[in-house]
Amino acid sequence: MERMGLNEIREEYLKFFESKAHLRLPSFSLVPKNDKSLLLINAGMAPLKPYFTGLQVPPNKRVTTCQKCVRTGDIENVGKTSRHGTFFEMMGNFSFGDYFKEEVIPWAWEFTTEVLKLPKNKLYVTIYEDDDEALDIWVNKTDMDPKRIFRLGKEDNFWEHGLGPCGPCSEIHFDRGAGEVKTSEEFVKASDEDKIVEFWNLVFTQFDKDEEGNYNKLANPNIDTGMGLERMATIMQNVDTIFEVDTIKAVLDKVCKLSGANYKEDRVKDISIRIITDHIRSITFMISDGILPSNEGRGYVLRRLLRRAARHGKTLGINNTFLHNLTDIVIENCYKNYPELEEKREYIKKIIKLEEERFDETIDAGMQILNDYIKEVKNNNYKILSGDKAFKLYDTYGFPVELTEEILEEEGISIDKEGFNKEMKEQRERARSAREETNYMGAEDTILNKIDLNINTDFEGYDKLEVKSKVAVIIKDEEFKNEMEKGNEGVIVTYNTPFYAEMGGQIGDTGIIYNDNFKAEVIDCKKNISGKILHFVKILDGKVALEDQVILKVNEERRNNIRKNHTATHILHAALIKVVGDHVQQSGSYVDDERLRFDFSHFEAVSEDELKEVEKIVNKEIMKANAVNTKVMNIEEAKQQGAIALFDNKYKDDVRVVSVGDFSKELCGGTHVSNSGQIGIFKIVSEAGVAAGIRRIEAVTAFKAMEYVDHKNNILKEAAQILKCNEKELLNKLNHQVLEMKEKEKEIEALKLKLASGAEDEILDNIKEIKGVKVASAAVKDIDGNALRDLGDKIRDNMQSGVVVLGSNYKGKVLFVAMATKDTVAKGVHCGKIIKEVATIAGGGGGGRPDMAQAGGKDPNKLEDAIKTVETVVESLVK
């Protein structure tokens, strides 16, 4: 056995299966496509599900891949052990109804023993206990020693997930110190002790499990294999853990260099070093695939990983931002197989640095709050932190709840998860509502995805808006039908169509389908998971049946407006790169007949001057009346010509390139004008942030742009009429009015202060004494926070000894302040505790120091009730 680098193992594997007539596919994105059962791709076969289920036709019946994967199910163990990690690569070879056991078992043995040259006396094989066929092949088609083959039960060697495709599997294992194993029992024991490790799983998908629990044979069985690249590298490099594998150790060494820590010298530091080493790999690949930090979904997973790694950097004594610098090491070791990493290097680093800086802004304050919570819990001999406090750390300071749990665990404290989940309910409901019912293989369980794969629709809509065709499929009420009549709504599929199906941010076409006997309104047009074009229709007249000859006609005016907006989006993209910077990348878009929306990577608001310049450039390109050309070419040729590709798309070998003069060139399957002059005019309506590092521009074109300008002009005219001036005088008039209002506001505030001073005497006259402590409390009207604090200071100073609690209803908001002299604090008074109890009654919350605290409330009607509780609260605190 010769030592092999991780990258070398990957290449040897893929080359081997290419030699067996497999198509090598690049790794799919970590973001699942058309699979709502997964947040992130977590297995080699996950992106290939549509091929296994028959929903899509594979590009080849034999495929081999090395798939990047992220799993965070056992993230709490990452770092604590040297085995766990969130990022890994899974090598696999797959057969979609082509070869089966008789081919894959000898191939697996050939690769293992002849390419990797693993010693045969170090290898073991397991099979499903009833799989005599697999045993026969291992014994008679390879030179594997039969004594080293063990039959195991369903739990170990049968792959199934609920109902549907399933089957037995055979695994190849490597002896890492077990010595000679003679029985299944000895084998299982050695595996549990990690003395024998599994490195390749061959799954034979040959059954379909039905609802009665029967295993029915599949007509076309499949092969699905998986070999963990990192685990294989530990074997080939004779190291104990993934953190000692060449490419991963390079990252670990950089972490040690940045922190000044030495690996394997301090158990606690080793945990932090491993966490950072693992997490930066996941972080780099996730951002490369277009995922951005957020508080929901996969963006939350990324934020959690990033902030967990940043926090462990601080544990190692790294007090500045550092994670973005580790990205270079990850990319240097991976870019040959993942060229997108190099292409997006600067973008990835900017996103990481931005998130690090945001976390840095809050972590110190958040840690101080958390430390206070820990002290409070311990002082009260509690073992649980309340859910509302954990939620405050999450909501205000950006602490993922898992990070809070991890820190608390070190102190022997847990979180009230029920209380936290209650606080999180709104966010969780939003996330849950976005999910639709799916089956276990990830496809939406709908009749629309069960259309015969042999039925194809040719799209002719680039050049035509009206075509003749035949009806291939009719769907109504979630069933395939032979006909559909007036008043019904459903789906029609034809053999060819001019209707553009919603895709790439462009909305689907509308129009009509008709013949002499019927007429249907097309209200939408989409694609199903296998790419079939679906016309969503309402039958207006007559009846339509399968194989009827029909005419399909697109709403021309609507399509033309969509074209204008789509081409304008391309010009906008190019203008943004020119004005804002070449880091700009599209992260989403939406184009319909009324407006366009463009999301792009940028790290701050686009300035007014920049927006004006962008708008000017776009209109300049429109006025040039540039020809808009489309050309189908090889993907590599398109890239060489500088065509912009979408951030997270995987493209076929041949792509459609849309060019607007020599100003813009993008890969695009949408519909466009033939000349930029047809757009007419372009106006930006808004610019805003939608996520960390992502901005959004909304704009209108043509007549909608004219309507927008007219609307703005009408507002100016109405404003001038209200101020009784002409439009030229409007700005001067407004400035004068604003200055006048500010003077009036100053006068009003001065009057309020006078009133507050008058209230001071009344409050002092009504002081109560509770257990030897003077208490002044009152609700005052229309005083802002500053004035309320000033009033509190005066009353406390006048009292010389005591506590004062004031509340105010200011512009519909409730404000509270509490102050106490030092001697009353010594007697047990704690303003933070008082203010928390009082503010809760008015629907608010807050806290602070023993001698001073402030809070807010939501219900002005409860202000008086809240103030009435002050004396009771003080009484409960005074010793």
From Swiss-Prot:
It comes from the Bacteria. Zn(2+) binds at residues 566, 570, 668, 672. Its cofactor is Zn(2+). It is found in: Cytoplasm. Binds 1 zinc ion per subunit. GO terms for cellular component: cytosol. InterPro entries: aa-tRNA-synth_II/BPL/LPL, Ala-tRNA-lgiase_IIc, Ala-tRNA-ligase_IIc_anticod-bd, Ala-tRNA-synth_IIc_core, Ala-tRNA-synth_IIc_N, Ala-tRNA_ligase, Ala_tRNA_ligase_euk/bac, DHHA1_dom. It is an enzyme of class 6 (ligase). It catalyses: tRNA(Ala) + L-alanine + ATP = L-alanyl-tRNA(Ala) + AMP + diphosphate. PROSITE patterns: AA_TRNA_LIGASE_II_ALA (PS50860). Its main location: cytoplasm. Its EC number is 6.1.1.7. Transmembrane segments: none annotated. One of its GO terms (biological process) is alanyl-tRNA aminoacylation. GO terms for molecular function: alanine-tRNA ligase activity; aminoacyl-tRNA deacylase activity; ATP binding; catalytic activity, acting on a protein; transferase activity; tRNA binding; zinc ion binding. PANTHER family: ALANINE--TRNA LIGASE, CYTOPLASMIC (PTHR11777:SF9), ALANYL-TRNA SYNTHETASE (PTHR11777). Belongs to the class-II aminoacyl-tRNA synthetase family. Consists of three domains; the N-terminal catalytic domain, the editing domain and the C-terminal C-Ala domain. The editing domain removes incorrectly charged amino acids, while the C-Ala domain, along with tRNA(Ala), serves as a bridge to cooperatively bring together the editing and aminoacylation centers thus stimulating deacylation of misacylated tRNAs. This is Alanine--tRNA ligase.
